[in-house]
Curated annotation (Swiss-Prot):
The keyword Lyase applies. This is Tryptophan synthase alpha chain. The alpha subunit is responsible for the aldol cleavage of indoleglycerol phosphate to indole and glyceraldehyde 3-phosphate. Belongs to the TrpA family. PANTHER family: TRYPTOPHAN SYNTHASE ALPHA CHAIN, CHLOROPLASTIC (PTHR43406:SF1), TRYPTOPHAN SYNTHASE, ALPHA CHAIN (PTHR43406). Tetramer of two alpha and two beta chains. It catalyses: (1S,2R)-1-C-(indol-3-yl)glycerol 3-phosphate + L-serine = D-glyceraldehyde 3-phosphate + L-tryptophan + H2O. Its EC number is 4.2.1.20.
Length: 269
């Protein structure tokens, strides 16, 4: 059983949703970013998505684009992102880490060495936003062969004809993007999310995590009543942007994570 399967199974047994947090690797700098990464589980993160900075993050809203820019300016590379995961795993062998980003940096790194190093570092899953199922052979197949889950994004515009193709080789969990557009934009209605989850469940047994537009503990709790996972990214990344120092960035991100976790954990009581 993979770490992701294990975590979602444990939470299902507890009768609660997972808090899935997104931060960009290397934002605001390597050391502070590593501190945030290491602090997230104790602050209540059940699964961590770690963004791999790339110069052209087309699916991301302004907050995550700026985070990517800060990380790249601070010297973050894909090799350093894998190093962060290695350092995280020294103290934590249970919290799943999913790398999220675009195919270009992986292609440049080399798929074979990337998959081998990601597995050795302790990466559990990949979300690659610009690789559709038609390109499975490039990365999804070798990653899954190495025991790394490949997580697909589905959106309100993924129709019933397309959905089986998208979900066919998915593993780990399904990431439902509740608002069509870029990250951090708007938020979906509870009714919309309820219908979307019901539709996805007709096609897959995988846990369903809902993200995009969730910013407050209240919003997180509302989604946690419906979905297997609640993904929060831009709201955490904004705390880094607003911080006056690296220490403040660490503290503010972890404080918000704790508040979100409280919302998620109390949602079904």
């Amino acid at each position: 059983m993979s770490r992701l399967e294990q975590r979602f199974a444990e939470l299902k047994a507890e009768g609660r949703s997972a808090l899935v947090t997104f931060v960009t690797a290397g934002d605001p700098g390597y050391d502070a970013s590593l501190q945030i990464l290491k602090g997230l589980p104790a602050a209540g993160a059940d699964v961590i998505e770690l963004g791999m900075p790339f110069t052209d993050p087309m699916a991301d809203g302004v907050a995550i684009q700026l985070a990517t820019l800060r990380a790249l300016e601070a010297g973050q590379t894909l090799a350093k992102t894998l190093q962060m995961v290695r350092e995280f795993r020294v103290d934590n062998q249970t919290t799943p880490i999913v790398l999220m980003g675009y195919y270009n940096p992986i292609h440049r790194f080399g798929v074979e060495p990337f998959v081998a190093e990601a597995k050795a570092a302790g990466v559990d899953g990949l979300i690659i936003v610009d690789l559709p199922p038609e390109h499975d052979a490039e990365l999804a197949t070798p990653a899954q062969a190495a025991g790394i889950d490949f997580i697909r994004l589905t959106t309100p515009t993924t129709d019933d004809a397309r959905l089986p193709r998208v979900l066919e080789r998915s593993s780990g969990f399904v990431y439902y993007v509740s608002v069509a557009g870029v990250t951090g934009a708007g938020s979906a209605t509870t009714e919309h999310v309820t219908e979307a989850i019901a539709r996805l469940r007709r096609h897959t047994d995988l846990p369903i995590s809902v993200g995009f537009g969730i910013r407050t503990p209240e919003q997180a709790a509302n989604i946690a009543r419906l979905a297997d996972g609640v993904v929060v990214g831009s709201a955490l990344v904004d705390k880094i942007a607003q911080a006056k120092s690296a220490d403040q960035a660490v503290n503010d991100v972890l404080s918000l994570c704790s508040a979100l976790a409280e919302g998620v954990r109390g949602a079904r009581r």
